[in-house]
C-alpha cells in the first residue's frame, strides 16, 4: 500500500500523547522508506502512481528522487527522514524481516533535528539496525 501503520508511538515527555495506531505515508517517513526500499518495483510504482503528496518543503515528490533515496536506503541498511513528513523532525528507520526474509515492517526513532544532529545519526542508525535485526531474528529470520 501507500501507507505504513504505526502500531506504537511513545513521546519522550510523559505528558505528551502515546499513539497506539497511526497511518503514515511510506514515501516520506523513515519507517515507510525502510519498508518500501525492499519491496518489488511494482509496489514502488504503485506508490508513485498514487501521488507523492508534499507534507513539508523537504518531502520527496519527484519519482526519480524517491527511487534514488530507496536505493541509498538499501545500500545503508537504514532510512532517514529529514523533516519530510513533519518539519524539524529527524528520523532513522530500519527494516524488519519475517521468517522468509521479506521486509514487512520497520522500526524507527525520531527526535527534533536540533536534538539529533547529523553527526549522531551514525550512532543512532547502529542502534536502530541492531534492534530491527533482533526483532527479525525473534520472528524466525536467519541471516545468511
Description of each model-found segment:
Residues 23, 27, 36, 58-65, ...:
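Alpha-helix N-cap/loop-to-helix boundary motif
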Residues 42-54, 129-144:
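Cysteine/selenocysteine-centered motifs that mediate thiol-based redox chemistry or coordinate metal-sulfur cofactors
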Residues 33-37, 71, 133, 137:
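Generic alpha-helical structural context detector
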Residues 61-132:
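Extended hydrophobic
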Amino acid at each position: 500500500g501507500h501507507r505504513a501503520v504505526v502500531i506504537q508511538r511513545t513521546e519522550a515527555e510523559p505528558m505528551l500523547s502515546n499513539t497506539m495506531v497511526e497511518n503514515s505515508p511510506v514515501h516520506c517517513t523513515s519507517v515507510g522508506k525502510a519498508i518500501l526500499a525492499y519491496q518489488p518495483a511494482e509496489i514502488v510504482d504503485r506508490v508513485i502512481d498514487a501521488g507523492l503528496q508534499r507534507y513539508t518543503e523537504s518531502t520527496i515528490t519527484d519519482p526519480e528522487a524517491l527511487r534514488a533515496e530507496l536505493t541509498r536506503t538499501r545500500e545503508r541498511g537504514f532510512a532517514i527522514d529529514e523533516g519530510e513528513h513533519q518539519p524539524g523532525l529527524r528520523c532513522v528507520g530500519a527494516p524488519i524481516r519475517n521468517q522468509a526474509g521479506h521486509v514487512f515492517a520497520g522500526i524507527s526513532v525520531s527526535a527534533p533535528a536540533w536534538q539529533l544532529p547529523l553527526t549522531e545519526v551514525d550512532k543512532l542508525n547502529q542502534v536502530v539496525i541492531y534492534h530491527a535485526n533482533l526483532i527479525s531474528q525473534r520472528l524466525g529470520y536467519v541471516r545468511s
